[in-house]
Amino acid sequence: MESQKKKDRYLRIYHQLKDFLVKSDDIDARMATIVAVLHHKMETFFWTGFYCLKDGELIVKTYQGPVACQVLKKNTGVCWAGINQGKTIIVPDVHQFPGHIACDSRSKSEIVVPLKDTANRIIRVLDVDSTTLNAFDQTDAQYLEMIVGLINL
């Protein structure tokens, strides 16, 4: 997708979500709404969901797409890299990422956006996979970070 078109789409999604999410302060409802809107509005999003930290494990929560890995092995894969590095991770080709966890063999690229709680601890990540190589860039990172920030409105 052309860069400006992608930015415009993300801005529309952001404002749409902001209007939706003020109606409930329930975190699960907010995550579900974010996932549903992103998954259906961004054509390259093949799997879209949240993994949450619980007792030192990453457990799948709300998602859309094919069946997910329920628990991600500690310190392995892109989601754990996002947590351990404390930043958004963009992987152009998941098959070149050491320790990549292949929940679905059709995934080719991935972006993971960590989300912190009010005490500044990472407690969950937004994970998005695509069946297209190099599907994600800094525009995706910038706007997905803004969008997941809406969870803590």
Model-derived regions: residue spans:
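A glycine-centered beta-loop-beta connector
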Residues: 116-123, 128
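A short, aliphatic-rich beta-strand micro-motif
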Residues: 109-117
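Juxtadomain coupling helices with adjacent low-complexity linkers
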Residues: 2, 18, 124, 130-153
